[in-house]
């Protein structure tokens, strides 16, 4: 079995490194394509011994399981490019947030009647074999195809099959989850530094606390609240800290973060499906939108091309 990645960014690197570290694939059985060969992830893949190419078609030709590891809005253009090269042996795995099985199948069915498509959502901890992955199989994918993907992804962490309509929510929870954890760790380390700990020690202690807590939960059948209560002694430091978190809306912030990620996932698919614009045009549209929405807009004045004119928007006529 050979595995191909269209896209050689963080996800492709994390999966390739995870697969090779787990021993389920050797590097020479992996190929990745990217139009840009100077990316840090491309350099890292090259050092691992992964085959690299600028040609997406070449990646399809030399793979059996094909991961679409690019941004959602690029998927339609990739499928138009490689559709004629996808054969009956290929299992096409879309890892792009919000991209539905039906949208991939519709594109590929212009080239062949029964493309085998699987939608997958994973996360970057696959790089250390601690990923969280769910997948849903398409109309023409066989049971064996799903089992093959599950075998691959289980080698780099937890993997299970779900109904496709759950995957957007999974994206908001575990797909984006590592970023929430890293932000929390950064804040915890800042707290430790504020109270006198060296930065390196503060980071290590915070990371180990989260790692240990996660392992305790996964190894037990107890509810997180019960494990939390076990840490709190009456009138102690921990319950006072938790009261402070509650008063700051800690739970609501996390719930809202999961919801925001899920909603954005659906927006990304809508942008690709409805606007039908090229990746370059989409990038320009987003940049223009950022400029319009930014509270500070910088432009070059016609009379002074070398000078920067900054217009600050004041709220209610007041200045900060």
Curated annotation (Swiss-Prot):
Residues 295-305 have a biased composition (Low complexity). GO terms for molecular function: pyrroline-5-carboxylate reductase activity. Detected in erythrocytes (at protein level). Expressed in fetal brain. Belongs to the pyrroline-5-carboxylate reductase family. The lineage of its organism: Eukaryota, Metazoa, Chordata, Craniata, Vertebrata. NADP(+) binds at residues 6-11, 34, 56, 69-72, 95-97. This is Pyrroline-5-carboxylate reductase 2. Keywords: Acetylation, Amino-acid biosynthesis, Cytoplasm, Disease variant, Leukodystrophy, Mitochondrion, NADP, Oxidoreductase, Phosphoprotein, Proline biosynthesis. L-proline binds at residues 164, 237-238. It is found in: Cytoplasm; Mitochondrion. Signal peptide: none annotated. It is linked to Leukodystrophy, hypomyelinating, 10: An autosomal recessive neurologic disorder characterized by postnatal microcephaly, severely delayed psychomotor development, hypomyelination, and reduced cerebral white-matter volume. NADPH binds at residues 8, 10-11, 34, 36, 56, 70-71, 97, 230. PANTHER family: PYRROLINE-5-CARBOXYLATE REDUCTASE (PTHR11645), PYRROLINE-5-CARBOXYLATE REDUCTASE 2 (PTHR11645:SF61). The modification N-acetylserine is found at residue 2. The keyword Acetylation applies. Homodecamer; composed of 5 homodimers. Interacts with LTO1.
């Amino acid at each position: 079995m050979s595995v191909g990645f269209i896209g050689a960014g963080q996800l492709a690197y994390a999966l390739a490194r995870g697969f090779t570290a787990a021993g389920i694939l050797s590097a020479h059985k992996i190929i990745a394509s990217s139009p840009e060969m100077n990316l840090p992830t491309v350099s890292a893949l090259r050092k691992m011994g992964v085959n690299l190419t600028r040609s997406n078609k070449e990646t399809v030709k030399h793979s059996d399981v094909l991961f679409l590891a690019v941004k959602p809005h690029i998927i339609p253009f990739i499928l138009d490019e490689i559709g004629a090269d996808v054969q009956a042996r290929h299992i096409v795995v879309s890892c792009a947030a919000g991209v539905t099985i039906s949208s991939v199948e519709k594109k590929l069915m212009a080239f062949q009647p029964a493309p085998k498509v699987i939608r997958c959502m994973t996360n970057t901890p696959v790089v250390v074999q601690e990923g969280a992955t769910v997948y849903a199989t398409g109309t023409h994918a066989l049971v064996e195809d799903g089992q093959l993907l599950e075998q691959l992804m289980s080698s780099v962490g937890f993997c299970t099959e779900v109904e496709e309509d759950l995957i957007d929510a999974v994206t908001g929870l575990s797909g984006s989850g590592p970023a929430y954890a890293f932000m929390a760790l950064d804040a915890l380390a800042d707290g430790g530094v504020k109270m006198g700990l060296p930065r390196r020690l503060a980071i290590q202690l915070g990371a180990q606390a989260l790692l240990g807590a996660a392992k305790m939960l996964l190894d037990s059948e107890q509810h997180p609240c019960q494990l939390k209560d076990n840490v709190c002694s009456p009138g102690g430091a921990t319950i006072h800290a938790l009261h402070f978190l509650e008063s700051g809306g800690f739970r609501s912030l996390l719930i809202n973060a999961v919801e925001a990620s899920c909603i954005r996932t659906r927006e990304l698919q809508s942008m690709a499906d409805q606007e039908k614009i090229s990746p370059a045009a989409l990038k320009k549209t987003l940049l223009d939108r950022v400029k319009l929405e930014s509270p500070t807009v910088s432009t070059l004045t016609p009379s002074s091309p070398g000078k920067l004119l900054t217009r600050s928007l004041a709220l209610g006529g007041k200045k900060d």
